[in-house]
Structures are given as structure tokens and as C-alpha cells.
């Protein structure tokens, strides 16, 4: 059974005033067309992907993304730093990734993984550095972004949960 809820007509003017009162605030079209929106079109150097569920399911969701990155036309490496233990060379093969274009690097802890990620990005020998860093502070995100910009690369952090 459906019930219809209608707003009392006395409330409608409150909403109309909020929507029609511009107070000099730019409309979305004005923001998109402004010169300062050019930075929106530039790809971000740092991205983060959060996947939750069973580890096997998360890797299944991640496989097409990694496959696409491994087949990138850019001749540089796809570097995977501190992946979960289940992401092995055998898993890469079964998932159909181009293993000839992938560097798989382990780190002893989160701090070492962050340092290794920044160095791999900064060197510019990888088109994309995929890391599994948790937790990742705002300062660490900025570090990864700066390193990616220096190396003209992309940083992708995967959070599994």
C-alpha cells in the first residue's frame, strides 16, 4: 500500500527562497566554465579505492583494474607495493595480467611501504604505483601525490576492509 505525503503549501515558499536567492553564489555552469576549473580536467596524481568484503571477492573486483593497468600503452612498469599475501605471481597469471610489465615489491612494514611507494613514484620508471597502505594519513597522501607528480606517474592506494 502506497501513501502519498504532500508538503504543506506553507513550507514551499521556504524552499523557493533558498533556491532562488543566489546571493552572488555561482551556479554550477558558471563554476564549470570558469578558468579555475581547468584543474578539474587534469588527472589527479593520487587516487584511493576502498573495497570491503571477503578477500577473495575484493581481489576479483580488483583484477580487471590491474589487468587494464598492466596492459597500459605506456612502456613503464605497473608497480605493486605491499599487496596482500593472496596476491601472488600465480594469482597475477590466473587473473590474466601482463606479468612482464609488473613489479611486485614487498615491504617489512607500513612505513617502509610508504617510503618505497614514494621512491618508485618519484623515479618515474612506473606509470602507476599501486599500494596497500593502511592507515593512510593526510600527510602520507600528500607525499604520494607530490612523488607521483615529480615522476609523472599515478599513485593508487587500495584499502581492503
Curated annotation (Swiss-Prot):
InterPro entries named in the record: Cell_div_suppressor_SulA, P-loop_NTPase, SulA_CellDiv_inhibitor
**Keywords, comma-separated and alphabetical:** Cell cycle, Cell division, DNA damage, Septation, SOS response
Per the entry, induction is: By DNA damage, as part of the SOS response.
Q: How is it modified after translation?
A: Is rapidly cleaved and degraded by the Lon protease once DNA damage is repaired.
Name a single GO biological process.
Answer: negative regulation of cell division
* Top-level taxon: Bacteria
Q: Write one Pfam family the protein is assigned to.
A: SulA
Q: Where is this region: FtsZ binding?
A: 99-104, 106-108, 120-125
**Matches recorded under NCBIfam families:** SOS_SulA_aeru
Q: What does this protein do?
A: Component of the SOS system and an inhibitor of cell division. Accumulation of SulA causes rapid cessation of cell division and the appearance of long, non-septate filaments. In the presence of GTP, binds a polymerization-competent form of FtsZ in a 1:1 ratio, thus inhibiting FtsZ polymerization and therefore preventing it from participating in the assembly of the Z ring. This mechanism prevents the premature segregation of damaged DNA to daughter cells during cell division.
Family indicated by similarity:
Belongs to the SulA family.
- Provide the assembly information: Homodimer. Interacts with FtsZ.
UniProt name for this protein: Cell division inhibitor SulA
